[in-house]
Amino acid sequence: YMRKQKNPQTEGSEHNRYANILNREFYAQKPMQKIVTDVTYIKHKGKWHYLACYLDLFNNEIIDYELSDTFDNFLVMKPAKRILEKAKSTESQILFHSDQGVQYSSAGYCNLLKSYNVIQSMSRAGTPRDNAVIESFFGRFKDVLRSHFQYWKCDDLQKVIDETVHYFNYIKPMRKLKRKPPVQYRLEQAA
């Protein structure tokens, strides 16, 4: 059972809003140019868990993610910081696009992105199509989690999430990537 909870309680009342700069242009010419992110909910063994993913629009690779049983700012900030630390040497600016969720609009998250000179973009309120790539990914991700990995039988949810991300990044071919998995496509484009 993986239905979203309505309005989970989170800390912080600040709510920054940013323009929809991505504007449904879900194509990137190179890695680390446009990153989309969102959080999904997974019920496992009677308890809600939260998965934040960051997806590179160049090749639809999940470049980082965080699984937690706590729906707080660290859920989205930990992977964002890891990505930005790795990308310090990137010459061009990176765009991060999200919905207007509390974590993505918090002062802590917005300040983190500013400190790395990231362009922040947000979907319009109530418009999930503005972040369609990650929304669609989560649908496929949960289908594979259910059917292929049968996550409900496993005691270690983190291990199953890791295996599912590995499957999407290294094994599952994508039509838009000439029938290659995301990591293989990225490596071949760099060669």
What positions do the PLM features span?
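Basic, flexible linker segments flanking DNA-binding modules
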Residues: 1-30, 127, 181-189
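RNase H-like two-metal-ion nuclease catalytic core shared by retroviral integrases
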Residues: 8-13, 98-100, 106-107, 122-142, ...
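Mobile genetic element proteins and their domesticated derivatives, centered on retroelements
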Residues: 22, 38, 54, 60, ...
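An active-site-proximal beta-strand-loop segment
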Residues: 24-63, 69
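Short small-residue beta-strand/loop micro-motif enriched in glycine and branched aliphatics
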Residues: 61-65, 120-123, 146-148
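Active-site beta-loop-alpha junctions of metal-dependent nucleic acid enzymes
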Residues: 66-89
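Short coil/turn segments at beta-strand junctions that form active-site/ligand-binding loops
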Residues: 92
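C-terminal domain-tail junction helix/linker
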Residues: 107-110, 114-118, 140-191
